[in-house]
From Swiss-Prot:
Domain of life: Bacteria
Gene: hisH
Protein name: Imidazole glycerol phosphate synthase subunit HisH
Alphabetized SUPFAM superfamilies for the sequence: Class I glutamine amidotransferase-like (SSF52317)
Naturally occurring in which organism (per UniProt): Ralstonia nicotianae (strain ATCC BAA-1114 / GMI1000)
MF (Gene Ontology): glutaminase activity; imidazoleglycerol-phosphate synthase activity; lyase activity
Pathway membership: Amino-acid biosynthesis; L-histidine biosynthesis; L-histidine from 5-phospho-alpha-D-ribose 1-diphosphate: step 5/9
UniProt domain Glutamine amidotransferase type-1: residue ranges: 3-217
Native organism taxonomy: Bacteria, Pseudomonadati, Pseudomonadota, Betaproteobacteria, Burkholderiales
Length: 217
């Protein structure tokens, strides 16, 4: 039986992710876990996150799960979701007062920056709003096993003010337009991560989770 650990460090859409995974893999052992030994023992690991990056990283460091997650990132399929994607990079411009940046896990080279859309108009004449909140198309800029069965230009659900900017273009596998063309999906070796929420993205999102369950990087 496949065991999937959803990392519980106090920040993230845990139950919705667990429900989505249980839907596509009813025979899997899906666990929301705050235990390092369970994360190490799992076959696959999901790192969720929502809210502000500084809060997520502070909660993550306080959880005592850093080493277990870093070990998992080296040895088994890992999926980052929303702020969980941003946490994989080296640093984020979203920082607490008096700090220049928030350090990430450094598993993916690059940084996280804020939408700079002040005063910009959308094609329909309305102003862009930050955060981006709602459905948007995703262009599959590179082929990947987790895109299998997902039509290019499918809609996914986004809620975010910041986005990842990977240092290596070949690690960007999905892009979206919102005033600027930005990376919304990253992949390297056994890691795949999305800015959008697959668990809130209907059948296209469920297919991402289904592919993750069967992925053999």
């Amino acid at each position: 039986m496949t065991t999937i650990a959803i990392v519980d460090y106090g920040m993230g859409n845990l139950r919705s992710v667990a429900q989505a995974l249980s839907t596509v893999a009813p025979d899997a052992d899906v666990r929301i876990s705050a235990q390092a030994d369970e994360i190490r023992a799992a076959d696959r690991v999901v790192l969720p996150g929502q809210g502000a990056m500084p809060d997520c990283m502070a909660a993550f460091d306080q959880s005592g799960l850093r080493e277990a997650v870093l070990e998992a990132a080296r040895t088994k399929p890992m999926l980052g979701v929303c702020v969980g994607e941003q946490m994989l990079l080296e640093r984020s411009a979203e920082a607490r007062a008096g700090e220049a940046f928030t350090a990430g896990l450094g598993l993916i080279s690059g940084d996280v920056i804020r939408f700079d859309l002040d005063g910009r108009l959308q094609p329909d004449g309305s102003r862009y709003k930050v955060p981006q909140m709602g459905w948007n198309r995703v262009h599959q800029s590179r082929t990947h096993a987790l895109w299998a069965g997902v039509p290019d230009q499918s809609y996914f659900y986004f809620v975010h003010s910041y986005y990842a900017r990977p240092a290596h273009p070949d690690e960007s596998v999905g892009e979206t337009e919102y005033g600027v063309r930005f990376t919304c999906a990253i992949a390297r070796d056994n890691i795949f991560a999305t800015q959008f929420h697959p668990e809130k993205s209907a059948q296209a999102g469920l297919q991402i989770y289904r592919n993750f369950v069967h992925w053999k990087p």
